[in-house]
Amino acid sequence: MSMEPRKKRNSILKVRQAVETIEETVMNSGPSSTTTNRRVSFHNVKHVKQYDRDHGKILDATPVKEKITDTIGSDGILTPRGGNMDISESPACTSSFQVFGGGNLDKTMDMSLETTINENNETARLFETTRDPTLLYEKIVETTTKVTERIVSMPLDDTLAMFNTTNQEDKDMSVDRSVLFTIPKVPKHNATMNRTIPMDLDESKAAGGQCDETMNVFNFTNLEAAEMDTSKLDENNTMNAIRIPINSNVMPVDMDITEHHTLIEEKKNDTFGPSQLMDISAPQVQVNDTLAIFNSPRDICNKGLGVPQNLINIASNVVPVDMDITDQAVLNAEKKNDQFETSQLMDISIPKVLVNDTMAMFNSPKHVSKSSMDLEKTIEAADKSTKYPSIADEVEDLDMDMDITEQQPCEAGNQQNDGLQLQKEDLMDISVIRDSPAVNDTMAVFQSPARVKIGANNSIIDSQKSIVFGDEMSIDETQNDGTLTLPKSNVEVTTTNDVYTSLERQEENASENVSMINESSVHSEIDKKSFMLIEEERAFMHSSMIDVAQKLEDDGSSKTPVILASQSASLATKEPSALHNSSATLNNSMELDNNTLLKTMQITTCEDISMVHESIAVELNSNKEQEQFGDETLQKNDTSNTGANFTFQGHNETSQIMNNVDSEAVNTSKISTYSAFNLSINQSISKRRRSLLNSARESPRRVALENSIMSMNGQTMEALTEYRQNKTMQTSQDSMPSMSLNDSGRDILAMNTSVRSPHLNSSKTAAPGTPSLMSQNVQLPPPSPQFEMPDFDPAVVNVVYLTSEDPSTEQHPEALKFQRIVENEKMKVQHEIDSLNSTNQLSAEKIDMLKTKELLKFSHDEREAIMIARKDAEIKFLELRLKFALEKKIESDQEIAELEQGNSKMAEQLRGLDKMAVVQKELEKLRSLPPSREESGKIRKEWMEMKQWEFDQKMKALRNVRSNMIALRSEKNALEMKVAEEHEKFAQRNDLKKSRMLVFSKAVKKIVNF
């Protein structure tokens, strides 16, 4: 009875063990580790966490939730009672917020604070630096920041204004006064993120009228709240040249951007500000002017800066225009506006403010803002009698400025004489730039041009003019079929003098018309300079990017390359393909018909390819050819009503033309033309070359196997021979001397030639199998001879036989050893074959076919088995060769080590030989001249010293020997004394033994006698 209370007491004091569930969890990212499910209890809810004991942290997965209805013990361990377990598994994959996820902003981020965190949600893993998890709690901190900055008013000198900051209003960070800024679902666009994203910005303003500054930390610099209502003018307008937006009496504009939505405003405003005509496809934010020195003047214009208000005065009966630039919106604007003043619509894309160009040398080519282009599109819809040029918002392939000048429709009688005469009203600067708000375009020439998918409802139809170089290389130029058309008359090829004349006429007309626009305006001089620059750029672009027409000579003996250009822009017209995820390439696969193929640039090969660029200068065609080209142009372009004159004089003459114009315009045009042209061309060429080289690259193993199979069957190697010939032809073409290179250092005529091109050796006009003109003129080497494949082909197994070049010499010993090993292996294989033949597993016919190497007589499975066996034999041979090579390597390493050791010893022995020449010279000097008394005395003294040193050394050695001999002699004497003592002791023991034996014998005799 006394033991029961003790047992009960022991059971009470017994330490309970925690229930642990150990399981093996295999991690995808690393080696397997043991995890333990630990039970953590908060508010009567037990969570089972997986704890990684190897790495010392709790995993994010929480697969089980248990609701506990009973009380938990004081020791923290739940007693096994009836409980309710709620098993809720997280979904397999949740959409997480990916900042760099290709611009897919339509995904939502899981911001719940539940303890069930999906292991796929990696948002909080960036801050996980501790081993043990901590409790999560919410902390709301309201902070109000007030930032006030002062700007020095400098109305005349804006040099230091670029280094100042903008006027920032008071920031109210309170939650109750913030503006709810909702980001709707944005459709997927190009992954390059270089296009404007249509966004529906729904704003609900509270008291204060300021934008929420919460997201400003993700912007570029300190930003000012963009006020959409610009009706209230500021008192200080000193920084209007730099600030955004332009302060004017403008009513609010709806930011809803749709495709077929016409905005109807109830309010009517007297004036129509320039900001209402701008493209506000993305909310323009005000950038800190500290970084303004890195922007070009055109970049400032891109942001909507510097448009004088006195140049834009539109009639008072104008209604607000929808921001959607579509045909419907333009037609609505055209219906509402009955009359426009032509003098008020000129040169809107050029900045009218004095911007400091201190850092202009570091800027990229000037760009005109997309907003100015949209303004010009709106102006274009007003004048029904005049057709202004219109280009698509985004050029697919060429990221450059394309300033296109159109002529005013003239009468039929004056069309030939005044072909290039332009009027002031007709000059429209249409520039195509990439839509990147507030971004410096200095590095734009190094970026790859990206395509934009044009909507089905868009009225702009892109057509591509294809110029094909040598069966393969094509250059696509994007034009607008809707408004930009070729003339009905014949295409005229003008000379350099005509270009100079047209330029002088343009300058005179421009200067006369500029003087008519607001003579009292402050910006009149700037307008004149701007128009001159625009006209010069247009002349340069017309001389650089036009159609080439040259006579195709029929004489077969002529070695001059002939270039045949397309006569119209619509010959190679094609619908824009699916460009949503397409790469930036200038060449798209398309089937060319006979007419298009004949009208593309075809280059015939000459013996000296350096003559190509010298003959590229276009000759004047005959009147008959012009009439033929004109007829084709009339058939292809029925809607054209304007005349155009094009000229092409090559790069050198174009540069000569531009020598008389402003240097800034020349440099800008060259950079914008050639940098973007070479960038897009070279990128597409390099990409095509990589793909072609990858497809043309064949492994030597496959070539040798195919070669051996063909030789076994007694057939010819047509495919391999043609491949080698084409490869040799490509090598010879690449090695041809070419002195005509473009600015990028590449040969334009040879940079896209590939023997694996689908157009090579195939022409629409020639019979199938007929080689091209280029391949006919190339000298090809003779085909390689047929050869029998040995049992172990060196091309297959990459064996380099150690054979000497001279057959009369003996072979290397390594080669002999290796041949013996190979012979032994062959004997083993032959023994296996004989054993198989003895068992009759193979028929005699198949054995004969194997011996004669007639593989085609076998079935497909049997051929596969033979090839597998052959590969196994090759692998076995490679293993044998590797073993032999390793053994020889070890032996050679040992020999090398021995030789190095011997060389080191020889080097030590010959170390003083380098001084023998000096010693020899000294001896000859002593022998030639008799020594003086002093020198002889010195020599005698040195000799005596040397003798004394030698005597001392000998005496020292003798003393050492004597001392050693004395020591040895003393040791010898001691040993002799010790030996004598031992002998004496031994003799005494013998005597004692003999005496004892004598006594013992006497005693024995006495006993016997008794």
Swiss-Prot record:
Domains (record comment): The N-terminus contains a number of repeats which contribute additively to bub-1 recruitment to unattached kinetochores. The repeats are not required for localization to kinetochores.
Keyword Heme: no
Annotated coiled-coil segments of the chain: 820-915, 956-988
Disruption outcome: Perturbed spindle-kinetochore interactions, segregation defects and premature spindle elongation. RNAi-mediated knockdown results in reduced localization of the spindly-like protein spdl-1 and the RZZ complex component zwl-1 to kinetochores. RNAi-mediated knockdown leads to embryonic lethality. Does not affect spdl-1 localization to microtubules.
Assembly description: Component of the KNL1 complex composed of knl-1 and kbp-5. Part of the ten-subunit outer kinetochore KMN network that includes the KNL1, MIS12 and NDC80 complexes. Interacts with the protein phosphatase 1 (PP1) catalytic subunit gsp-1; the interaction is direct. Interacts with the protein phosphatase 1 (PP1) catalytic subunit gsp-2; the interaction is direct. Interacts with the MIS12 complex subunits kbp-1, kbp-2 and mis-12. Interacts with the NDC80 complex components ndc-80 and him-10. Interacts with knl-3. Interacts with kbp-3. Interacts with kbp-4. Interacts with kbp-5.
Single GO biological process annotation from the record: attachment of mitotic spindle microtubules to kinetochore
Positions annotated as Sequence repeat: 85-88, 109-112, 228-231, 255-258, 278-281, 323-326, 346-349, 402-405, 428-431
Keywords, ordered alphabetically: Cell cycle, Cell division, Centromere, Chromosome, Chromosome partition, Coiled coil, Cytoplasm, Kinetochore, Meiosis, Mitosis, Repeat
GO molecular function: microtubule binding; protein-containing complex binding
GO CC annotation terms, alphabetical: cell cortex; chromatin; chromosome; kinetochore; outer kinetochore
Subcellular location: Cytoplasm, Cell cortex; Chromosome, Centromere, Kinetochore
Annotated stretches, region: 9 X 4 AA repeats of M-[D/E]-[I/L/M]-[S/T]: 85-431
Protein name stated in the entry: Outer kinetochore KNL1 complex subunit knl-1
Function: Acts as a component of the outer kinetochore KNL1 complex that serves as a docking point for spindle assembly checkpoint components and mediates microtubule-kinetochore interactions. Kinetochores, consisting of a centromere-associated inner segment and a microtubule-contacting outer segment, play a crucial role in chromosome segregation by mediating the physical connection between centromeric DNA and spindle microtubules.
Predominant cellular place of this UniProt entry's protein: cytoplasm
